[in-house]
A protein has these predicted regions:
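Conserved catalytic core of the tyrosine transesterase superfamily
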Residues: 1-274
Length: 274
């Protein structure tokens, strides 16, 4: 457990101890109803669902420890649930914005590298860590495939679009390298995630995208645009390398948002009065 988590848990248990004292009891003597009342009181204090979940997690860990050491007979936290945190929808670029971003000029220093990096990022929906770790041996430009090692050491192959293939070929011609070399080299080995983030911010402003653009935005945009065009949730899950399809389902909400906008703009009974 990290030092940051330990500090957070210490604050959570201190808050619970203070509340228990106000109720003329102590941590060891708390009943489930009292612990539930504590969580409700914290909710009324407008603690976020995420903070409440962490607070309850600290309580569960503490009472598991007491149970293990014979200080209590049962955990009062065992059956208590905190309010679920609302899941934020990921931000995405629309198709025009994504195209504008990746079509950076190639006749400037590092232009071919930047074009290849952005085209591949958007074309294949890679994670930032996967993109940075790429070696030329991982790319098959003739077949249009890139093979990456994702989370949980799971390997997957993802298609590479024609624009990305052309950009990568131009970049390799500009800077020849053997098959074991990084596709996007940095100062000492592969380019770092931080370097990609900084470069992306620079390029976004240069391309006229005056919004917060971060590396994962291209992966979100890839997923949203492929799902919008295909409607194949399972296919998008495999392309992204998600172990659980529930993780991919967040993009169906984005697709619904798009459909809702189309409906509002096109349906004769949905148009707003001016």
């Amino acid at each position: 457990m990290s030092a940051h988590t330990l500090d957070a848990y210490r604050r959570d248990l201190t808050a619970l101890s203070a509340w228990a004292s106000e109720q003329a009891t102590d941590l060891v003597s708390l009943h489930p109803e009292q612990l539930r009342a504590f969580i409700a009181a914290e909710h009324r204090r407008r603690l976020s669902p995420k903070s409440l979940q962490r607070r309850l997690s600290a309580c569960r860990s503490f009472y598991r420890w007491l149970l293990k050491h014979g200080r209590i007979d049962a955990s009062p936290a065992a059956t208590i649930r905190a309010p679920k945190a609302p899941r934020k929808l990921p931000q995405v670029l629309d198709v025009d914005e994504a195209s504008r971003l990746v079509e950076v000029p190639t006749d400037v220093p590092l232009g071919l590298r930047d074009r290849a990096l952005l085209e591949l990022f958007y074309s294949s929906g890679l994670r930032l860590s996967e993109l940075c770790a790429l070696r030329w041996r991982d790319l098959d430009l003739a077949e249009g495939l890139v093979t990456v090692l994702g989370k949980g050491q799971k390997q997957r192959s993802v298609p590479v679009g024609s624009h990305a293939r052309a950009a990568l070929a131009a970049w390799r011609q500009e800077r020849p390298a053997d098959s074991d070399a990084p596709v996007f080299p940095g100062r000492n080995g592969p380019i770092t995630p931080r370097a990609v983030q900084l470069r992306l911010n620079q390029l976004a402003q240069r391309q006229g995208l005056f919004k917060r653009v971060h590396p994962h935005l291209l992966r979100h945009s890839f997923a949203s645009h492929v799902l919008e065009s295909s409607g194949d949730l399972r296919g998008v899950q495999e392309l992204l390398g998600h172990a659980d399809i529930a993780t991919t389902q967040i993009y169906t909400h984005l697709d619904f948002q798009h459909l809702a906008k189309v409906y509002d703009a096109a349906h004769p009974r949905a148009k707003r009065k001016r």
